């Protein structure tokens, strides 16, 4: 959905996705993450309770009760692209894979992803860069996607962008040799971004 939804709107979205063969929908809080205000719904009868619970959890955790809905991708992998920008240009510092999670909390981060085909890696990276350019992005941030490499019609979807460094930025630092904290400090002081010259480590996977 494009924004916060009412129960009626969530139900309409569920019916639309079901007609397209989706397994269900994911309800997610607008105000924050960490698994709070977030539920997968695969049965239309469960939607009213799930919608109400997510709104209640979101209000308690973030002070904002709004939730949105998206297509449920049951076997998706979680891929995030590290993007620096200086307001004029943007670059990619490669991806991290954080599919291994418990209760929607990331347990392991791998950079680069050993499971991502090269063509799909390129498509996802370009999608992240297009969004960053469109926003005139100036910061270090993470553009996150769900990926279903076996799908011929919907191989990946955008989840969210976090316009800040996250704790997992050190994984990207290890792969590029860059000090991203210093990079962000320099950017805040007005220095142009030069991280695009860094080359992320190549994947140990086949990439096929």
What spans do the regions from the language model cover?
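ATP-dependent carboxylate activation and anion-phosphoryl transfer catalytic cores
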Residues: 24, 34, 41-208
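A conserved helix-loop-beta module that forms one wall/lid of the active-site cleft
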Residues: 1-30, 35-37
């Amino acid at each position: 959905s494009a924004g916060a939804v009412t129960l009626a709107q969530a139900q309409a979205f569920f019916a639309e996705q079901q007609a397209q063969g989706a397994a269900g929908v994911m309800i997610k809080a607008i105000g924050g993450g960490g698994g709070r205000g977030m539920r997968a719904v695969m049965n239309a009868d469960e939607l009213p309770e799930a919608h109400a619970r997510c709104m209640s959890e979101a209000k308690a955790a973030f002070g904002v009760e709004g939730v949105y809905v998206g297509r449920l991708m049951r076997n998706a992998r979680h891929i995030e692209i590290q993007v620096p920008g200086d307001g004029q240009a943007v670059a990619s510092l490669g991806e991290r894979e954080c599919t291994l999670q418990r209760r929607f909390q990331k347990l392991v981060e791998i950079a680069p992803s050993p499971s991502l085909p090269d063509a799909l890696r390129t498509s996802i990276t370009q999608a992240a860069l297009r969004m960053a350019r469109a926003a005139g992005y100036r910061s270090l941030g993470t553009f996150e996607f769900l990926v279903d490499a076996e799908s011929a019609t919907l191989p990946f979807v955008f989840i969210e962008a976090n316009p800040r460094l996250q704790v997992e930025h050190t994984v990207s630092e290890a792969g590029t040799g860059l000090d991203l904290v210093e990079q962000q400090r320099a950017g805040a002081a007005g220095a142009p971004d030069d991280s695009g010259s860094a080359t992320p480590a190549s994947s140990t996977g086949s990439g096929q």
